[in-house]
Structure formats: C-alpha cells, structure tokens
A protein has these predicted regions:
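A conserved ligand/cofactor-binding region detector
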Residues: 1-779
Length: 779
C-alpha cells in the first residue's frame, strides 16, 4: 500500500468517526482510527481465510485458556499487516510521532503471566503458519489488577482497560450462549431413552466479542473469542413489586463472572466464583464449537476428524464433561460413543510440576454449583475406576490416586489425564518430571499419550518489532530469511569471532540500554546508568521463582561495598518486575523487601554509583517490549524441578541476554542450544534436590559457617529506618521450602563469574551472539 493510499484511508476513518482532520486530531483519535482500520482489514482477512478452510475441510484448532496476555495490538497488527512503515511515514508527514500513538493503547487486561503469554504466542504462531486457530477466554472487565507500589507494599487497583481497548473488539450478542448454574436435576427414562431436566437453575448469558491476530506476511488470521457474562434479562417483575435490590442483584451476580481474572480464593465466595468462571468459559466455548461444527457439517459424527481442542492448564477442564453433557443430553449419543469423541478431540497441556498446585474442587461446592456436570464426572469416575482396576488389579492405592474424585475433591488434572489423547509438558525436563512423579501412574496406564512440546514465543514481536537495531545487523550479516523462519538465526554463529560484528553487538546493546533508561526516566522518574550491567528478573512474584535469593545477594553485595568502597566492582542495576497474587502474603513481603532494599541502596551516596535496584511497577507486555532489547542478564533462578518451562527466558535469549540460572525448565534447553559456556549456570540439579528432600532439608546446615549468608540475613532481619523483614528471613532460616540457602553460595559464585566475564567486552558480546543465534528453536 502506498503512502498516499494509506493517508486517504486514515483521513476517511478520522472523518467518519470523529469529523476531524489528521492535522488537528488527538492522539487518542488517531490511535482509535488506526485500530479500526487494522480490525477491519483483519476481519476481512479472517473471513477469507476461514472460507477457504471450510471449503477444503481443514481441521479447526480451538485453544481454551483462562488468560491471554495479549499486550498492545496496534504496533504488532500494523507490523504483521505490513503497514507499520507506511503508517509511520503518513504520521511523520503530519509531524506526529507514531511511538506516541502506540502509547495511547492500554495493555489488554486479559492475562497475568507466562500461561497467558504462551496462549497469545500460540495464536500468533497458528496465524502465521496458516493453521485455522481460535482462542477462547473471558472478557475480563478489570483484568487481574493494576499494581501500585505504596511505601513498598503492593496495592491492587482496578485495571479499567476496556475504554481504550474495546476498539479491538467486535461484539456478537446474536451469538450469545446460555450457561446454567445451580438447581436440581431430574432424570427420566422413556422407551430406552434417557432424559435430563434441569430445574430451578440460574442462567447467565455468555456474550461473545472477537478480536483478531494477523499472521506475519498475511498467511492467516487467528480469532480470539472472549465471553462476557450478562444476566439473561432484567427482572422486571421484582422491580415492579419494589424489590429493587433483588432485581439488581441478579444482574450483578451474573456479571461478576467476567469482572476480574483470578479473584482471590482465600474464602468460600472466591472459590465458588472461580469455579463459576471456569465452567462459564468451558460451557460457552464448547457450545460455540459444537454450533460452528453443526453449521458446517450438519452432524457431530465427524467431530473428532475436524476439531482439535487444546486445554491450556486445568482451568478449562470442565470443557470435557460439558462436551459429554451436550453429546448425551442434547444430541442423544450413548456414553461410549460420546466419550470416544471426547478422547479423540481433547488434548491437555500441563503447566506445573508441583502436585499441590493441581486444581481440585470441594465436592459439595461442585455438586451445588454444577449439578449435572457433577453427575457426569461421577459416572466418568466410576468407569475410570473399573478400567484402572483392570490395568492395575488389586492396587487400590494407585487407583485411588488416579481417580477423578477422591478425598471429597473433584480432581481437574486427573479428568484431563484420563480423557485426553495427548498430555504434554512444556519443556524436556518438565515432561520427564511429570512422567516420573505427578502423572507417573497415568504414564504407566497410557504411555503413548505423553509427549513434550517445549514452550515458544512469537519471536517477531520480541525481535523484529522490539529490537530494530539488532535486526538491522542481522539483515546485513545473515540476510532476511530469519524473518520468515527463525532457524535461519543460526547463520549468525559464523560471526562469533568477527571482531567488527562483536563490536556492533556491544554498541547496539548500549544504545538499547540508553533508550530504556530514557524511557524509564520519562515514565517513572527513576534514573539508571546505561553503562551499568542490566541484571533483570521479571516474572510473577512467587517463592519458587526465588526473587528473595536475588535480593539476599543484593544485600550481601551492599554490605560488601560498604566495607570495601574502593573494590573493583562493575556497576550493576538490578531490575525487578512482578505482581503478587492479592492473597499471597509472603510474595507481598518479598516485594516490600526488594523495594525497601532498593530505597536504601539508591539513596546511599557511598554505593549508589555502583549498585542500584529498580522495581518496575505494573510490569506488563508493553513494558517488556522496551526492556528485553536492553537486558544483559536474565535471572532464571527457580529451584531445579519447580519451573515447568518459562517463556521470558526465551525472549531474553533472543535479544542476546545471558541466562544466569539453574538447570530448570527450559533453561536446560537454552543451555544446550547456546552452549553451557555461554550461560551462567549454578545450583543443585533436580536429582540432588530430590535427594536432599528425602534425607531432610535443614537450611541451618547451609547458613552455619557461611559468614556472608549470616551477615545478609542478620542485616535484613534487623532492618533499617524502623522496618525489618524478619518474616522473610525467618522463613529462610527455618522452613525455606524452595532451598534458597542451599543454592545461595553457588549463586554468589555465578554472580562473581558474571563480573569477571562482563569485564571482557569481546567475550561477553560473543556469548550474547551465541544466545541470539541459537534461539530459533523457541519460535
């Protein structure tokens, strides 16, 4: 498209929507107009793409996930449509900076962490490779929450993203689906047919809104269908009788389902709301999938041949019994045929190696909230136990562990494991661990179902759209084929000894650091030194991710620099970004400790030129796009055997950051790909962790005799300015569930190696090059 053509399209949209000329339009008006242009183009492309797929009988892939961490859409949509350069030129001609327009868009409040980002990347990947993919989730009105740090404490505020983000959504109230909760079930048999009557239920309407993800170079378009909860109709009779609260409460109760992502479940009301959310997503999505299939083929007999449904984690597990309900109650299939269809259609991705994190629901809550689904799960469980008895005769312990219901709980992961045709982990290590521990019995029962699908990233977003200077170097050295196939990045390996290229890599990284420092100062007022090492740990705040290990080392470095002010120490900026779950007290204490430690260090003139700590409030995808090109060290320091995979580690690697990490999750594959000599590996291996657990782990054994560990713990315990962090340190001294103290000494060794290697600028650039060159396997 020419500049002139695009300028006319933009002006026409500004005129029709706002009645203004480009020269006087506000940034918000320009953003919305560009978004509408992209949405219209992608909608038309999607219609053509789907029409062709239906005509050839192509299989449809449906991806159900509780969250999709989409970030901003304008920049990536223009980029994938091939319109970013022309849009930039049109705006520049009007003396408008396109980056300022991008900043008008809020991050979509549809996700939280790696689970949601993986889901978003899969949509991008399906669209780019021409797979007919549709994602399903909930249209959260307020997202998870907007993070505000006040005096070191995380505060949660409503993330009112829809006013700015709704422009990407097209609502389809005519395609709404009824979802039923509560009530009683009556069963009747008539001439051999089984009839179900659901009475006294509460209805909620699932109203769909669609947004689109354009594949790179226009190969395909994926759709993300988001469900908004609405009351079926206003209770006029109650209102007319003066029962205003009753009339309004029905609306409020229904719409609560799509208010926020992951409501606090530290109380019974929160648990019920989460269960309702999960069934709402599952029932609406399965109803939509069945309707789509029937409208195309007129029968469900071929559903398994034409449909694949991927369950991303256990949140959408109820899609399985809901599909059974539709096939049994509405379509007249017998049990065996219905379950055979489910087995062929559903696949399951597991995201945790910790058995305690696998979702389970109290039977009483489940039965009350979803009476018909409970009946189906009970029958599934009965049949499963019969089948398992044949496979493991007399092994009651194994059968009880594998059962779908047990200990007064409905076990989501076991429903998936029993039904799904494919059960995958998200890294090689994780996939082995689930076969050996969490799902070992199911692996013995159906070994052919278990496989590994290592996580990946939408690399064009994190490289092409985020790091143009590095892309320019890649274009000049290896050509542009990598833009279409990431495996071509490996061609960069032949420049590992090219001093000119290595010098350019260091220059590009420094320039990206300057850009990030300027962005940070402008947006937050925080000042950092671009010549310092940028050491980054940005991920969900959780004990198993061990941000407190990082903080403990920072405290140790602070004490060292106070005692040795003239020490040879390359200046370092530690960058954190993370949200803690609202009800997770220890994670919030960790945030407070990091923020207060940062305040102390950043305001101490004796050390602040050598050591700084930055906490990125409200860390999100768009902020990540600024940070990734500037990062030099990627902290991936979870206890070996606890992190399933990770995707942030891959984005850092792609942009040339060196992984400082344990051999956990996808770190193993990163080290294998780039070479362990090009990463900073520390800590126990998974078998060592397991052995230590078996013999009994006592953190005191690792603290005793370690003067540095003792000094750092004592320092944090005593605190400063009337604040202390004894709850964190007491946890580390006594229980330390994620073995921070066991790995602390080796972590310090890795940090010392980092300082030594970074001093050799050519060697560091070579390590950086090796990471970028070998990151293509994660695309």
């Amino acid at each position: 498209m020419t500049t002139k053509e695009f300028a006319k399209i933009l002006q026409d949209k500004l005129t029709s929507e706002y009645g203004v000329d480009l020269s006087v339009a506000s940034k918000q008006q320009i953003y919305r107009s560009l978004a509408l242009i992209c949405r219209q183009m992608m909608s038309e492309n999607h219609k053509k793409f789907q029409s062709k797929a239906i005509g050839t009988g192509t299989k449809q892939v449906y991806y159900l996930c509780m969250e999709f961490l989409m970030g901003r859409s304008l920049k990536v949509s223009l980029f994938n449509l091939g319109l970013e350069d022309v849009a930039q030129k049109v705006l520049a001609d009007a003396d408008i900076n396109i980056e300022g327009i991008f900043e008008e868009e809020p991050d979509a409040g549809l996700g939280n962490g790696g689970l949601g980002r993986l889901a978003a990347c899969y949509l991008d990947g399906m669209a780019t490779t021409g797979i007919c993919g549709t994602g399903y989730s909930i249209l959260y009105e307020y997202g998870i929450f907007k993070q505000k740090i006040v005096d070191g404490w995380q505060q949660e505020r409503a993330d009112n993203w829809l006013p700015g983000g709704q422009v990407w959504l097209k609502s389809h109230p005519d395609q709404a689906i009824e979802v039923r909760f509560d009530g009683e079930i009556r069963e009747n048999w008539d001439h051999g047919f089984h009839y179900i009557q659901h009475t006294n239920y509460n209805s909620v309407m699932a109203v769909p809104s669609d947004m689109y993800v354009q594949g790179y170079d226009g190969k395909g378009v994926a759709k993300l269908r988001l469900w908004q909860a609405k009351a079926p109709d206003f209770d006029m009779s109650s209102f007319s009788l003066g029962n205003y609260n009753t009339a309004m409460s029905k609306n409020a109760s229904a719409e609560l389902i799509s208010k926020v992502l992951y409501p606090n479940d530290n109380h019974i009301e929160g648990k019920i709301l989460r269960l309702r959310q999960q069934y709402f997503l599952s029932a609406a999505s399965i109803g939509d999938i069945v309707q789509n299939h029937l409208s195309t083929y007129g029968t469900l007999e071929n559903l398994a041949d034409k449909v694949a449904i991927q369950l991303n984690d256990t949140h959408p597990t109820l899609a399985i019994p809901e599909m059974m309900r539709i096939l049994l109650d509405e379509c007249g299939f017998d049990w065996d045929k219905a379950f055979e269809i489910c087995q062929k259609v559903f696949a399951y991705t597991n995201h945790t190696v910790m058995a305690e994190a696998l979702e389970k629901w109290n039977v009483d809550i489940f039965k009350m909230t979803l009476p018909r689904i409970y009946q189906i799960v009970v029958e599934m469980n009965r049949r499963a136990r019969e089948e398992l008895e044949k496979a493991f005769p007399g092994d009651e312990g194994k059968i009880n562990y594998m059962a779908l219901i047990g200990d007064n709980q409905v076990r989501m992961a076991n429903i998936c494991a029993y039904t799904a045709n494919s059960i995958n982990g998200v890294s090689k290590l994780h996939s082995e661990i689930i076969k050996e521990s969490v799902f070992h019995d199911y692996y013995l029962f159906k070994p052919q179902a278990f496989k590994n699908v290592t996580n990946g990233i939408a690399y064009r977003r994190w490289l092409l759209a985020s790091n143009p200077e590095l892309c320019k170097l890649l274009d000049e050295t290896i050509g542009e084929e990598y833009k279409h196939d990431a495996s071509n990045l490996s061609k960069l390996n032949k420049y590992a000894d090219d001093k000119t290229v290595l010098k350019r890599i260091n220059e590009i990284k420094l320039n990206n650091k300057k850009n990030f420092a300027a962005y940070l100062e402008k947006s937050t007022g925080q000042v950092i030194d671009p010549n310092s090492i940028f050491d980054c740990q940005v991920k969900r705040m959780h004990e198993y991710k061990r941000q407190h290990l990082n903080a403990l080392n920072i405290a140790a470095q602070y004490l060292y620099l106070k005692e040795n002010p003239n020490a040879d120490f390359i200046p370092k900026t530690y960058i954190f970004g993370a949200k803690a779950a609202p009800g997770y007290y220890m994670a919030k204490q960790m945030i407070r400790m990091i923020c207060k430690l940062g305040d102390l260090i950043n305001n101490d003139p004796a050390v602040r030129d050598k050591l700084r700590v930055v906490y990125l409030e409200e860390y999100c995808v768009s902020l990540s796009e600024h940070l990734m090109p500037a990062a030099e060290v990627s902290e991936q320091i979870s206890l070996a055997g606890t992190e399933a995979s990770g995707t942030g580690n891959m984005k850092f690697m792609l942009n040339g950051a060196i992984t400082l990490g344990t051999l956990d999750g996808a770190n193993v594959e990163i080290a294998d790909a780039a070479g362990k000599e090009n990463e900073l590996i520390f800590g126990m291996l998974t078998p060592e962790v397991n052995n230590l657990k078996q013999v009994g782990y006592h953190p005191s054994a690792f603290i005793m005799g370690d003067d540095v560990a003792n000094a750092a713990l004592n320092f944090l315990e005593r605190g400063w300015n009337g604040e202390d962090f004894h709850e964190v340190t007491e946890n580390l001294r006594t229980s330390d569930p994620y073995m921070v103290m066991a790995d602390f000494k080796d972590y310090r060794r890795a940090q010392a190696d980092l300082q030594r290697l970074y001093a050799d600028r050519e060697k560091w650039a070579q390590m950086s090059l090796k990471n970028t060159a070998n990151s293509g396997i994660f695309s």
